[in-house]
Amino acid sequence: MADSAGLDQPEPSPRPVLVVDFGAQYAQLIARRVREARVFSEVIPHTTSIEEITARDPLAIVLSGGPASVYTEGAPQLDPALFDLGLPVFGICYGFQAMAQVLGGTVARTKTSEYGRTELKVLGGDLHSGLPGVQPVWMSHGDAVTAAPDGFDVAASSSGAPVAAFENRDRRLAGVQYHPEVMHTPHGQQVLSRFLHDFAGLDADWTAANIAGVLVEQVRAQIGNGHAICGLSGGVDSAVAAALVQRAIGDRLTCIFVDHGLLRDGERGQVQRDFVAATGAKLVTVDAAETFLQALSGVTNPEGKRKIIGRQFIRAFEGAVRDLLGDSTFDSGIEFLVQGTLYPDVVESGGGSGTANIKSHHNVGGLPDNLRFKLVEPLRLLFKDEVRAVGRQLDLPEEIVARQPFPGPGLGIRIVGEVTAERLDTLRRADSIAREELTTAGLDYQIWQCPVVLLADVRSVGVQGDNRSYGHPIVLRPVSSEDAMTADWTWVPYEVLECISTRITNEVAEVNRVVLDITNKPPGTIEWE
């Protein structure tokens, strides 16, 4: 199982399009959109030097937006030497203004700021060729480019931006004042793709799936003849990370699965059956449900529950690791710890430069200092949807690859109130019904996540049969999202909701009311606790 059979032969790591982050909330989204155009991309901070950029051997540069004014003291600066590299460059919002200023254009504060949906008028050029002459875009600016640099054609304007887009085909330079990366700009992806493929001349030949072989070889080179462990949660990230490492080093990987008793119905069996069957990985299961329940007894504060669950998880994982280290079969010890860190975590921690310490958002990130491992993070350059693509390339079961996000503390934070064995059983049965009906209705790929919440400290009066009931409410929380930073509530057909409600109130005796949460994020978080 240590070979990479079935995968494409590994190729060199792809040259990236570098997204220079000027403090934009959308920098990661820009990188995602570039990858959706089938070109590999990475985010780097605006403090990255020209020498560092050159060393990365990029295919092109995208300058992100940002909250500052180019005239504000201390505002992020753009090194003019960037334009001496001969690389294609595309500026967005603040990056567009910084680009204009450095190249000799004029940036000024106009009388009209633009925030939100704005009408863009196309004046010519190639960026918007074939697109509507007047189209909606998403703007967020106070300053504006009032004169394009010499040699640039003005491609579009708006009421608050005399120069809302410019381009220079000969130098492969272009930019826009609006945000092409957001869904509120309907033709934005076409504009970005046109720059990448037509202006920059880049091939659309990158996908997450076709780098699975590369990732396997990178892991094999990093671990060599060593042994590794991986904390397996049953989620997509840890499962794909473990599968990659197992493909690279075979039975020198041991996965540890801590069953804290807060899982949904059937999840333990899924991990033990489907994951092991698909990968052949060695799996150690730790039964810790009773320990977790004892620690959570009497606790109702959400943050308190999270801390207790995290602390107990670390202790259970640590105990399993110590048992392994005491096993004589590990003569050389265990040197490596596999984690399912994803690219958003790398960027948010300041790791985009490749030099900063990377935070760990996974449960095993809190291991004591005296248990020192070298980190293996095979997914650290991928987004969630790309991780799923790699998982499919590795032939992981669809039940694992397409699994909806599930919080580390599990059902413990989907019970509003104290966590008890009885309440877990009630929630587990209600959750199982909801998931079953959503799957039957074919909604698994339309709903990003659907938390089912038990309001354990709330009761309401009802009538079940000829008797008065006094049961708990269950909350359904279907949402759609790309990265969990924002989320919209998702419409579910009424007949599906009716079926879920009827089954839960009929089959789960402790529940007599089912309600629907239709709150977006913000203001509401996806999870209730």
UniProtKB/Swiss-Prot annotation:
Q: Which residues form a coiled coil?
A: none
Asked if Hydrolase is a keyword of the record, the answer is no
What does the record give as the reaction this protein catalyses?
Answer: XMP + L-glutamine + ATP + H2O = GMP + L-glutamate + AMP + diphosphate + 2 H(+)
Known Pfam families for this protein? Answer: GATase (PF00117), GMP_synt_C (PF00958), NAD_synthase (PF02540)
Ranges for the Glutamine amidotransferase type-1 domain? 16-205
Query: Which Enzyme Commission number(s) are listed?
Result: 6.3.5.2
Q: Which domain of life is it from?
A: Bacteria
Extract the GO molecular function terms from the UniProt entry: ATP binding; GMP synthase activity
Q: Which positions fall inside the GMPS ATP-PPase domain?
A: 206-403
The record's listing under PROSITE patterns reads: GATASE_TYPE_1, GMPS_ATP_PPASE
Q: What does this protein do?
A: Catalyzes the synthesis of GMP from XMP.
Record's subunit section:
Homodimer.
The residues listed in the UniProt record as binding ATP, with positions renumbered to this chain, are S233, G234, G235, V236, D237, S238, A239
Per the record, the pathway is: Purine metabolism; GMP biosynthesis; GMP from XMP (L-Gln route): step 1/1
Key words, A-Z:
ATP-binding, Glutamine amidotransferase, GMP biosynthesis, Ligase, Nucleotide-binding, Purine biosynthesis
Q: Which GO terms describe its cellular component?
A: cytosol
For this entry, the protein name equals GMP synthase [glutamine-hydrolyzing]
Tell me which species this is from.
Mycobacterium leprae (strain TN)
Where's the active site on this chain?
Answer: C93 (nucleophile), H179, E181
